Amino acid sequence: MAENQNNLIWIDLEMTGLDPERDRIIEIATLVTDANLNILAEGPVLAVHQSAEQLGLMDEWNVRTHTGSGLVERVKASPFNDRDAELQTIEFLKQWVPAGVSPICGNSVGQDRRFLFRYMPELEAYFHYRYVDVSTLKELARRWKPEILAGFKKQNTHQALDDIRESVAELAYYREHFIQS
């Protein structure tokens, strides 16, 4: 393992909803790639404990999705609060990327960053202010080269580590079929 300023930090959060003023983080996962999108390491995948009251605020989609994946039970049983998950994640990242150099990478990471800012501010500050948002390329491909969209199928497991791996693979797909074409 070697700290490298060109490595990229990828993150995905699962939340109880989309509003950081009301909803909470229930799972966090990170991984690190090199600049060529080769996965170097996967960080801890942590269910973040939330109260039954907080979980009761989830809408039907979140209840169905996170119950079906087993995440709700993992959240109820988890010994980790927001701060525990934040610190474990930062300790992992320090081994691979210095603070303040990697953009936050993933799909729709602007949403994740809003939750990090509210509930895990030290982790949010670990990232550079820039973004590598795969969903931007997807939206551009939808408008400029829609025929390539059928070539990449997501599994949509809504499990944080699976989602990050898919984001890395999706960016590699767009690099080959959209950016370099």
Curated annotation (Swiss-Prot):
Its EC number is 3.1.15.-. InterPro entries: Exonuclease_RNaseT/DNA_pol3, Oligoribonuclease, RNaseH-like_sf, RNaseH_sf. Its main location: cytoplasm. One of its GO terms (biological process) is DNA metabolic process. Pfam families: RNase_T (PF00929). GO terms for molecular function: 3'-5'-RNA exonuclease activity; nucleic acid binding. Keywords: Cytoplasm, Exonuclease, Hydrolase, Nuclease. It is found in: Cytoplasm. Residues 8-171 form the Exonuclease domain. GO terms for cellular component: cytoplasm. It is an enzyme of class 3 (hydrolase). The active site is at Y129. It comes from the Bacteria. 3'-to-5' exoribonuclease specific for small oligoribonucleotides. NCBIfam families: PRK05359.1. PANTHER family: OLIGORIBONUCLEASE, MITOCHONDRIAL. Belongs to the oligoribonuclease family. This is Oligoribonuclease.
